[in-house]
Amino acid sequence: MSRKKSLVEMADLHGUACKLPQGDLEDLLKGVELPEEGGRVEVGVGDDAAVIRVDGGYVIQSVDFFTPIHPDPYTQGRIAANNSINDVFAMGATEVLSVLVVSGFPRELPEEDAREMLQGFADQCREVDALIVGGHTIMNPWPILGGCVTGFAERYVTVGGAEPGDVLYLTKPLGTQPAMAALRLPEDVRKQFLTDSELEEAVDLAVEVMTEPLKDAAEAALEVGVHAMTDVTGFGLKGHAGEMAEASGVRVVIERLPVIPGTTELSRALGYGLERGESAETAGGLLVAVPEEHAEDLEDAFERRDVWYRRIGRVEEGSGVEVRGDVEEVEDYP
């Protein structure tokens, strides 16, 4: 009798690493004539979510789905929901109005596993008072799960407002991709890098990262009045910092790379580029640019909400991204 495949064995790419690479996406869109933006659209293609002006504020809309990164169906459902919803928080939404579920399941996936994925998704939505109002489900060779999320904001923050002199904060450690990849390695290979207890710690921390909503972090940023913010996901810290640099017309310098313990050596062996800020993240932290004179206010706002953070860099005149920081294996998350 054949062994039942786990969720992660049903896909070749996992979590936000299944996203089309950043450069490939940019090349693809160059050949597409999109309808002109206008009317009520304040922010369109190129940010974490679209922003549409309505009476009394702004509707924030995003869609996000991906393949499994965790073998447990319920946990995977929670991660998928959190990753979908975080995009609207990263634009300043203070309320999630609705979620439409996007799902695809292989024929060989047991119905109970699919149901557990959906239950995890629903429970994570409940944690941030997000109502599921519908969805669409297809048969698909790889399992996929995510959602189209609609939020509301009285004001919004884009990725493109960073200014020279700003300092940068990150609200979660990096390293989800190598941490979860360790689960898929043959035991004899994995033990070259991590003991059983180290693996358990790394995976547990990665799950904490991937299921922690950005709601409190975003509320703190809005309270202080930050210049720019974005969530760190499939393009990695360097890629999303690059989006901030390009959209803002500035240079971003990364001086510190806080990571989940044990993931740096794994990343070097597997070629993920975590030590260069290039490793894909799934449902990662909020990257925030704030004027240096308001940095202490932001730290205070984070601490009052029990939001973990690190000051990781600064914004200069110029262009592009420079990663010159040392890796820090964090011991205080969450």
Swiss-Prot record:
Example of a GO MF term: ATP binding
Known EC number: 2.7.9.3
Cross-referenced Pfam families: AIRS, AIRS_C
One GO-annotated biological process of the protein: selenocysteine biosynthetic process
Site feature (Important for catalytic activity) residues: 19
Keywords associated with the record: ATP-binding, Kinase, Magnesium, Metal-binding, Nucleotide-binding, Selenium, Selenocysteine, Transferase
The keyword Lipid biosynthesis is annotated on this UniProt entry: no
Residues reported in the UniProt entry to bind ATP: 19, 45-47, 64, 87, 135-137
Role played: Synthesizes selenophosphate from selenide and ATP.
Complex and partners: Homodimer.
Name of the featured protein: Selenide, water dikinase
Species in which this protein is naturally found: Methanopyrus kandleri (strain AV19 / DSM 6324 / JCM 9639 / NBRC 100938)
Lineage: Archaea, Methanobacteriati, Methanobacteriota, Methanomada group, Methanopyri
